[in-house]
């Protein structure tokens, strides 16, 4: 009989990273905050969904604020002090997430909007009639 395979437990080792990049992906339905080191390797991430929100509540500025606070705390546990913020998307949680990063104790050195804008690419979805 085959021996059962041993489960390897991955421990998140403490990375000492002083500077980082906070990527805020804000859509109408959710906000995802990923904090990476300068080369782009993820250190911490959180979203409105992982903070316990569901449905339409995920798109609110308050949900984005909690997601940014959670990601900032995890990043500060790894020794992060300053971040550059790259914001992508049209969602409601853009400014709330940036303010939450500053309030959590991270020093924001740069705020850049990297929302992709098409040069008339795909046809957009039809207008909603409510």
From Swiss-Prot:
Keywords: Ribonucleoprotein, Ribosomal protein, RNA-binding, rRNA-binding. The keyword tRNA-binding does not apply. It comes from the Bacteria. GO terms for cellular component: ribonucleoprotein complex; ribosome. PROSITE patterns: RIBOSOMAL_S11 (PS00054). Signal peptide: none annotated. One of its GO terms (biological process) is translation. The keyword RNA-binding applies. Coiled coil: none annotated. GO terms for molecular function: rRNA binding; structural constituent of ribosome. Located on the platform of the 30S subunit, it bridges several disparate RNA helices of the 16S rRNA. Forms part of the Shine-Dalgarno cleft in the 70S ribosome. This is Small ribosomal subunit protein uS11. It comes from Caldicellulosiruptor saccharolyticus (strain ATCC 43494 / DSM 8903 / Tp8T 6331). The lineage of its organism: Bacteria, Bacillati, Bacillota, Bacillota incertae sedis, Caldicellulosiruptorales.
């Amino acid at each position: 009989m085959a021996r059962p395979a041993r489960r390897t437990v991955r421990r998140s080792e403490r990375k000492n990273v002083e500077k980082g990049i906070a990527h805020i992906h804000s859509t109408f339905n959710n906000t995802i905050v990923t904090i990476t080191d300068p080369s782009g390797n993820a250190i911490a991430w959180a979203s409105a969904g992982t903070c316990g929100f569901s449905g339409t509540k995920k798109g609110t500025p308050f949900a984005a604020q909690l997601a940014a606070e959670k990601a900032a705390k995890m990043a500060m546990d790894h020794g992060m002090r300053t971040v550059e913020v790259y914001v992508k998307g049209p969602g409601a949680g853009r400014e709330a997430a940036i303010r939450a990063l500053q309030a959590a104790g991270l020093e924001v050195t740069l705020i850049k909007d990297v929302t992709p804008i098409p040069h008339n690419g795909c046809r957009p979805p039809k207008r909603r009639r409510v």
